[in-house]
Amino acid sequence: MEIKENLFKSDRHNSFYLSSGPEEGELIIMTHGWPELSLSWRHQLKFLGELGYHVVAPDMRGYGRSSVYKDHEAYSQREINLDMVELFTSLGKKEAIWIGHDWGSPVVWNMALHHPDKVKAVCSLCVPLGFGEHPENLMNTVNREIYPVEEYPAGQWDYQFHYYENFDDAQKEMDEDPYKLVKILFRKGDPMGLGLPAGTSLTRKNKGWFAEFGGIPDFPIDEEMISEEEARTFAKYLTENTFFGPNSWYVNGEDNQKFNETINDQTLEMPALFVHATYDYVCDTTS
């Protein structure tokens, strides 16, 4: 199954996207998370395209070959929602099945909430409906048996507060070596971590993600998850674009909340699927 490269341009934003399958097929749009690319959906693009769907996976704003912006506000869900509406409209279909992972999940939930007429069904991997706002709103999801409040006041979400309080330091730490960071992040979950605090619960105490190690550790690639060539591709665009855009998705909580307050009825009438990842300890939302 051929995967095609495409570029949609509007007056306000450029969206690079990968596509597969017949253009007359039922449309599926898949949105990636932090810090990824449309390439993250390479296996699903081939599989779903072979089933006869027209499958589209964009580089989200701030990533890859889509538009990159220099102010935090450009990465609000309000702006990202407009990107998706424009891209969807350009594809000439009445509705689509929307699938999102990680930060791509609030994107598809918001399409379902704000534009239900454009959503035949919605699916989210790892992030439930209602996330994407300020991390203060996530405290009710912290399992205090794992994260005693005295030691871990923000639980697994501590790293999100780090972006608000030390954005420049967080970006500098990641920009140091995106290739090493990709090798750390793109790997299977470890069953041995079940029931233990996630490392992200101590980000502020440790003054960053990797300060205690003296920089980003050099881990071997998890070849069951990603190839050397793919890791280099992710690192290439993260190096060119920097982590300013990807990390800015985390610091628009107030505006994201206001955006969703504009909706009168937040009941989804279309089919919806949420898939929780048992070994994703950072995004543990099942407490």
Predicted regions and their residues:
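Short acidic-hydrophobic surface loop/beta-edge motif
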Residues: 4-10
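Flexible "cap/lid" subdomain of the alpha/beta-hydrolase fold that forms the substrate-access gate
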Residues: 2, 14-15, 27, 63-99, ...
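A short loop-to-beta-strand scaffold at the N-terminal edge of the catalytic core in hydrolase folds
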Residues: 11-19
